Structures are given as structure tokens and as C-alpha cells.
Regions:
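Conserved short alpha-helix immediately C-terminal to the canonical SAM/SAH-binding motif I
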Residues: 102, 126-129
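Acetyl-CoA-dependent GNAT
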Residues: 5, 9-12, 20-92, 103-105, ...
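Conserved catalytic-core motifs of GNAT/GCN5-like acyltransferases
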Residues: 119-121, 136-158
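Conserved GNAT acetyl-CoA-binding A-motif
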Residues: 110-123
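Conserved G/P- and acidic residue-centered "switch" motifs that form tight phosphate/ATP-binding loops
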Residues: 97
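Exposed loop/turn and edge beta-strand positions of beta-sandwich/beta-sheet ligand-binding modules
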Residues: 59, 83, 116, 153-155
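Conserved active-site tyrosine of GNAT-family acetyltransferases
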Residues: 130-131, 135
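Short, Lys/Arg-enriched N-terminal segments with co-localized hydrophobic residues
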Residues: 1-2
Length: 164
């Protein structure tokens, strides 16, 4: 059955839930495309709830998809230069079109604020959602994430969408 979702701006009391969504998305959905070492290194990079408050205070914009109880189940984080740094879905709320709606909301905001393009680094898992929203994959990015005493190789995709 279809649940009703509302896209709304971030509120301060969302921070803890967003940190949970991020951790769950990486650890639950990540293994479908990435190795255990890659997933562990990716998850360890993210410092938790406080960081959302700092980023919003610094001018980043977050839109959340909230369920009928107004609890966030997905979100997008947009920086003022058009860079989308986060696009994450709670594992129980994937394949509902939320990523597409969040990216459309980010694009509307970006146009209104004079940004000329949106761009992101998309995981293998997120790339189809970006492409459905009109982004083009420009290149594959191979890099490493330091984790414990080693560097874990991983990759993602540069994607972008002109807004003009």
C-alpha cells in the first residue's frame, strides 16, 4: 500500500534521525554493491548528528521526506555551490520515488537561488536515481578511504545536471 510522504525542510530535531538513516543506508544497502571492508570504511567516515547542525548553520540546505508520523525516512543535503553531498533513504523506504522527489526539490531550490548546475558523487546504488532525475554520469571516480591501518579502494560516479 502507498504511504503518504511529505517533502519538507530540515528541522533541528531531525539531526539524530538523519544520522540513523545514513548509517542504516550504508550498512544495509551498501553490501548490495560494495565489499564488507568498503562498507565499513564508508560508514566510519560519517560523524553523526552534530555534523548536520553544523552544516545547516554553515549554509547547507537539507530537505527530508517524512512519513505520516512526520519522521524523516530519506533526505538530500545540498551545498550552496550546487553540490549534493548526501542522498540517503532508510532501507525500509526505498523504491518509493523519494530520491527522485528530493532531487526535484533540490533542483527547484537551486534554480531559485541562482545555481547553474547540480552535481554529486553517486554510488553504484544511487546512480540510477540521479539518472532518473535527469543527471548525466560524467566519469567514474576511483579512490581510497583510510580505514584502520589500511586504505580501502572504492569508487563512485561524477554526475551532474545543468539547471539553465
Amino acid at each position: 500500500f502507498a504511504m503518504a510522504y511529505v517533502i519538507r525542510p530540515y528541522r533541528d530535531d531531525d539531526a539524530e534521525v538523519l544520522a540513523e538513516i545514513l548509517a542504516l543506508a550504508i550498512t544495509d544497502i551498501g553490501p548490495h554493491a560494495y565489499s564488507p571492508a568498503q562498507v565499513a570504511a564508508w560508514a566510519a567516515r560519517h560523524p553523526g548528528a552534530r555534523r548536520y547542525r553544523e552544516r545547516v548553520a554553515a549554509g547547507d540546505v537539507i530537505f527530508v521526506a517524512a512519513d505520516v508520523d512526520d519522521r524523516p525516512v530519506a533526505y538530500v543535503l545540498l551545498e550552496q555551490d550546487g553540490h549534493i553531498d548526501h542522498l540517503y533513504n532508510h532501507p525500509e523506504h526505498t523504491r518509493r520515488g523519494l530520491a527522485t522527489q528530493l532531487l526535484a526539490t533540490a533542483a527547484t531550490y537551486a534554480r531559485k537561488h541562482g545555481m547553474e548546475r547540480l552535481y554529486a558523487e553517486a554510488s553504484d546504488l544511487a546512480r540510477p536515481a540521479f539518472q532518473r532525475a535527469g543527471f548525466t554520469a560524467t566519469h567514474k571516480r576511483e579512490f581510497t578511504i583510510p580505514h584502520g591501518d589500511r586504505d580501502v579502494p572504492i569508487h563512485n560516479w561524477g554526475v551532474e545536471k545543468p539547471l539553465s
